[in-house]
Amino acid sequence: MQVRIFVAVALSSALLAACGGSSNSSRAVPVNPATNNNGSPATGVITARFDPTNGVLPFPTNLLLSGTRDLTLNIPVVDPNNFGDPKVALNALDGFSTVSPMTTSFSVAPKVSTLIAGQTVRVFEVTLTGTGGGVTGIVRELQATADFVVAPTSSDSSGRTLAIVPTKPLKQLTSYMVVLTSGITDAAGNDVTPDQTYFLTKRTTALCVGGVSQEPLLPNATACALEPLRQLTGSQEAAAGAAGIAKDKIVVSWVATTQAITPVLQALQNRTAQSAPPATVIAPTGLTLGSLGVGLPPVADIYIGSLEVPYYLGVPTQANPTAALTGFWRAAPGAYVPPFAGALDPTSTFVTFANPFPVVTTAQKVPMVLTIPNASSGRTKPAAGWPIVIYQHGITRDRSDAFAIATTMAAQGYAVVAIDIPLHGITNPANPLFVGNTPLAGLGVRERTFNMDLVNNSTGAAGPDGIIDTSGNAFINLSSLLTSRDNIRQAETDLSTLTRAIPTMRYSGPADFDGSRIGFV
C-alpha cells in the first residue's frame, strides 16, 4: 500500500538527481563502472522504492505515527471527520494489523528467486525508544515459513510489489523491523539499490547541526528535515548490523508496531466482573422443543427472557434512523489510564490501549431464549443448578438457532441460553418468538435489529420496502469500518455480560443455574 505522507522531506527532483553518488566524492574524479555483488558489471538499475515526499513508502510503517498526540496513527487525510474514508478509520487505531501482509515496492520487478525469507528479506521483533522511535535492540528474528513467507503481490500485475505475509498472527503492541538486502536482483542479475531518500538517510554522520546542513548539496531546511529520518534509519541499520547484516548491503529498512488486540476487551471484562450482575427477566412460553414442528423431541422447555447490556454503539432514532450504521465506540475525552493520564491529547475520544473504556450510549434490553431439560429428558436439576451452555449463532442467523443443539444438551443435563449479536434477531413478525409477539415488548425489550427497514430485501437497493431488513444485513459495514469492528467488539462484551448474569438468573428457584459450569458453543 502506498500512503501519501508528509514527513518534511521536501526534496526536489533536480536535487536528488544530483545526489547519485557519495556526497564526499569529488565530482571531477572518474569512478569505476558500477558492479554487482558477484563482480559482474551492472547493466540496469533496480531500486527499493522509498520516497516519502511522493507517498511511496513500505506499508505499514511507523512513519505514519509521526506527530501522533494520542498514540493512534496519523495519516494525512482531507477530512479527519469522514470516517467512511478508510484512511480516516485507520487513524483511530493504535497500531497496525497483526495478520495483514506488509508490502514494499521496487522500481522494476525483482527476480522472484532472489526474494528469500530469512536471507534477502529479514524480519525482527525489536524494542524502540518510544512510540514511533528508534530501534534500541532486537528481541528475536522471525523465521522463514514458521513466522512469515514472501512473494510478489497478486494485486500488482507488474510484479514490482513484494508482500511479507505472516503465517501466524504477530504479537500485539509489538514492533517489527524489516530489512531488505542487495541480494535481491532484477531479472538481469542487477543488485537492488537504495532509493535516493533512503540513500541519504544511510549517512552515518548528521545531515544537520544547529540548523546548518552538513551536506553540500542539501539546503539547510532539507537537511534538517531529513535528520530525524536519518536517525531512525541509523538505529535500524545498527540493530541489523548486530544481527550480522552489513550496512552497505541494506537497501531499505522500516519498522511497524502492531495494534492492541485484547486490552480494551479485557478492561471491559474486568469492569463487568467487578460490577453487580446485570438485570434479567425469564418467562415460560409453554412450549417445548417438540412444539417447534421440526421433528425435535420434547425434552426441553422453551423460555424467553431479556438481558440488560451496556451498549456502546449508535441506536436508530426518528431523527437519525441510520445511527446504527455509522456509530462506533468512543471513549470519554482524554480519559487515559496510567501511565498515560495527563501526557496525551486531552480531547481524543478514540478507544485505544491507553484510553480503553468506551462511553455507554444506552442500556439495551436484549432478548434471550433458553431451553431447560424437562422430565422427558430423564434429567433432574442438580442442587447447584443446571450447568448451562451459551450458544452463539453465526452472522445473518439469530438466537433461535440454539434449538438445534438443545436436544443434545438436554440429554446431557445442560440448559442452553442464547442472545443475538448486534443488528441480528428474529425479523419475521409472524414468528411467535418475535419480541413484538411476547410480553417482553411491554418491558422495553427490542429485537437487536431495531426492526430497521433501510434496504429492499429483494434487490439489496437502498431504501425501505416495508419489510424489516434481514438479520445481520448491516453487521458487516464496509462504508464504516470502525462500526464493523465495534459490532464485533459489542458482541464479545455482551457475552461477558451474559456470563456475569447467569449465576443470578432465575426461572423457578434460588439456584437455577450453576455459575461454575458455563460452556460455550
Regions found by a protein language model. Give the residues of each.
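Short beta-strand-to-loop junctions in surface cap/lid or active-site-entrance loops
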Residues: P367-A384
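Acidic, low-complexity Ser/Thr/Gly/Pro-rich repeat segments typical of extracellular/periplasmic
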Residues: G21-T322
